[in-house]
Amino acid sequence: MTDNFADLRRQWDDLAEQVRHHRDAYYNHTPEISDAEFDQLFRQLQQLEQEHPELAVPESPTLRVGAPVEQSSFDNVEHLERMLSLDNVFDAAELDDWLQRTPSATYLTELKIDGLSIDLVYRSGRLERAATRGDGRVGEDVTANAKVIEDIPHRLQHSDAYPVPELVEIRGEVFIAVEDFALVNEQRQKEGGKPFANPRNAAAGSLRQKDTEAVRKRRLKMICHGIGASEGFEADTQFDAYKALEAWGLPVSPYTKRVHSAQEVQERVTYWAQHRHDATHEMDGLVIKIDSFAEQRALGSTARAPRWAIAYKYPPEEVTTKLLDIQVGVGRTGRVTPFAVMDPVFVAGSTVEMATLHNQTEVKRKGVLIGDTVVIRKAGEVIPEVLGPVVEKRDGSEREFIFPTLCPACGTRLAPQKEDDADWRCPNSQSCPAQLSSRLTYLAGRGAFDIEALGEKGAEDLIASGVLIDEAQLFNLTEDDLKRTKVYTTKAGALNATGEKLLANLESAKHTDLWRVLVALSIRHVGPTAARALAVRYRSLEALRAADVEDIANTEGVGAIIAQSFAQWFDVPWHRNIVEVWADAGVTMADSEADIPDQVLEGLTIVVTGSLVDFSRDSAKEAIVSRGGKASGSVSKKTSYVVVGENAGSKETKARDLGLRILNEDEFKQLLANGTV
C-alpha cells in the first residue's frame, strides 16, 4: 500500500511539474508543446486526482488560473473580482454530459478567441485601469498601452436604455486580426525584427511593450466577453449585459448567438468546426455559457472555473505539404534538434514553413523522407509538428535524412549526454556560437536580466564580430566594443540609438534581484520558481555556493535534481569565471537585507487550504517561505498552523481531528507580520 502510494505520488509530482512548466511557458509566450499536448497532460493530472483524491493538494496546478505574475517594469494590481479560467471538453459526448449536468432554457455560444485576456475598470464612465489576467487575482497594469488600442474607449458612451454605472469591471480579449497579422510581421521584418510566430504571441508581446508608440502600430483589437465587479448595473442575462456593453461603445463579438436546446448547442459546435477560418480572428474553440445570471449565481464556481460555462476545444488542424529538407538547430543547452523545412502552407491561422521533428529517434519512428508529402498539424503552438508521411504519394525520388556527426554551428563532434539518450548534444558549450547566442537571448529575457536591446540579431552580431566569446564580458561592454558590430552602429560607424539603449540596459541590469541572476546563469532545471526559493533562503550567491548539495536539496521547492545540477554547474571553471567577472563588473550577487522579510516563521510548518481573498496559492506559499517557514501541502501532527479559506475541504477536517491551530485569513496576515497569533 505504502509503495503503491509512493509510486502514485511520484507520478503526480512528475505530471504536476510538467503542467506547471508548460503553463508558465505558455503565459510567458514561449510555449514548448502544442495546446493539444498541454490539454492532454492537464487531463491526465485531473484524472489522477479524481481517482486518488489523497494526492490532490491546494497548490495543485489543476486549481490554478493563469500563471504567476513575473516581476517586470509593469506594476502589479489586484482585480476587483477574480478572473477565472474555463474548464474544457473535447468531444460531443463530453459536451453532452456537461449539458445534462447544467440544463438551461437558454445558452449563449461565442467563439473562444486565441488572444490575451484583459481586465478594464471604468469609474464614473472613465477608464481608470487596464490589467492583464496574471494569476486571476493579480495582473500587470497595462493602462497606458490599453489607451492606444482604438477598440478601448477612454470614456463610456451615454445610453438611456443602459445608464453608465458608477463602477464596472469589464473582461475581454486583446488580439490581432488574421488579415492584420501579415502586415504587422511585414513591418516588423522591415525594421529588422524577427517575425512573430502567430497572432496570439504578437498580441501578448505587444500589450507588454514599454513603448506605447510601438503598441499603437501593432493593430491590436479587443472584444468584450464578460463583466466582473460592478456598482449601479443590473442585468438579467449575459445577452443583456452584452447589449449594455455595446451601448456604452465597447466591442462585442458578432459571432455570439443565443440557443435554446442542447441540440442547438451541438449544431453550433459543428458549424464552427467547419467554418473556423471564417472568423476575422484566430479561435480554438466555442464557449458555451448559461445565459441567465440567476442560474449562474446558483451554480457558482470551482477554485479555477465557473460551473455555468464550458469551452469546447477543437482538435488540432491537419494539412499536407512537401518536405523540402531536414535541417538541425542547436539550442541553449547544446541539444541538436532536427526540423522540417517545407513548402509554405496555411494552417490554423498562419502560414508555416518549418516544423519540429524533436530528435533523430522521432525522425526514424515517423518514417519521413526528404521529398515526402507530409501531414502536419498546428493548434496555436509556435512551431507545428510533422505527424508522418503520405506514403502513397512517393515517387522514388525521396531520400533518407542522415543525422550529422558534427555540430553545424561550430564543427564539434556530437554525442549523447548519456547512454541511450535520444537527444544528441554539442559538448562545446562555452564557445559554440549557436549555444552562446541562445544563452545571451535567454539571459536578456524578462524572466532574467530584462535587457530589452539585446535580441537574437544583436546576440549573433556580438558573437560574429568577436566582441563576445562567452557571456562573461557582457557587463564590460563599452561603446568602442559596440562600434565593431553592425546592429548597434549607424552606417557611418557611430553608436546608434539601440547601442546606447543596450549600454543603459546593461547598467540597469547590474542592480537586479538575486533570483534573476540565478535564472540568467542557464543552470539546467533552475527556473524562476527554484531560483526564488534559493534566493530567499541563502540571500547571496556566496552563501549558496558554500552550501552542500544535501542542504540545497532540502530547500522548499528545490529537491535533489536541482541541487545536483547547481553543484555540477559550478564545477566547471568557465562557469565560475562568468560569476566572478560579472561581480567585478558590478552585478549584484546578493539581496539587501531591506528586501528580505524578517524570518519570523523559521521552524514553523504551515498548510494553506481553501481559497483566500488576498492570496493566490503561490503568493501564500511565497509569503511563508520568504519568512523562513515551510509551506506544506499535507496536514500532519508536525503541522504548526493550518490556514483555512473558502471551500477548505478535508484538510480542515483532519486539522480539527488532530487538534491543530486553525487560522483564518486575517490571523494568517498577523502571523506573517509577527510570527505569532
From Swiss-Prot:
Pfam families with a match to the protein in the record: BRCT, DNA_ligase_aden, DNA_ligase_OB, DNA_ligase_ZBD, HHH_2
Enzyme active site: K112
Gene3D superfamilies referenced in this protein's UniProt entry, alphabetically: 5' to 3' exonuclease, C-terminal subdomain (1.10.150.20), 6.20.10.30, BRCT domain (3.40.50.10190), DNA ligase/mRNA capping enzyme (3.30.470.30), Helix hairpin bin (1.10.287.610), Nucleic acid-binding proteins (2.40.50.140)
CDD domains given in the database record: BRCT_DNA_ligase_like, LIGANc
Necessary cofactors: Mg(2+); Mn(2+)
UniProt EC number: 6.5.1.2
Keyword annotations: DNA damage, DNA repair, DNA replication, Ligase, Magnesium, Manganese, Metal-binding, NAD, Zinc
GO biological process: DNA repair; DNA replication
Region (Disordered): 189-210
Binding residue positions for NAD(+): D35, A36, E37, F38, D39, S85, L86, E110, R133, E173, K289, K313
Spans through the membrane: none
One annotated Gene Ontology cellular component of this protein: cytosol
Broad class of enzyme this protein falls into: ligase
Purpose of the protein: DNA ligase that catalyzes the formation of phosphodiester linkages between 5'-phosphoryl and 3'-hydroxyl groups in double-stranded DNA using NAD as a coenzyme and as the energy source for the reaction. It is essential for DNA replication and repair of damaged DNA.
Family: Belongs to the NAD-dependent DNA ligase family. LigA subfamily.
HAMAP family given in the database record: DNA_ligase_A
Protein name: DNA ligase
Organism listed in the record: Corynebacterium diphtheriae (strain ATCC 700971 / NCTC 13129 / Biotype gravis)
Gene that produces this protein: ligA
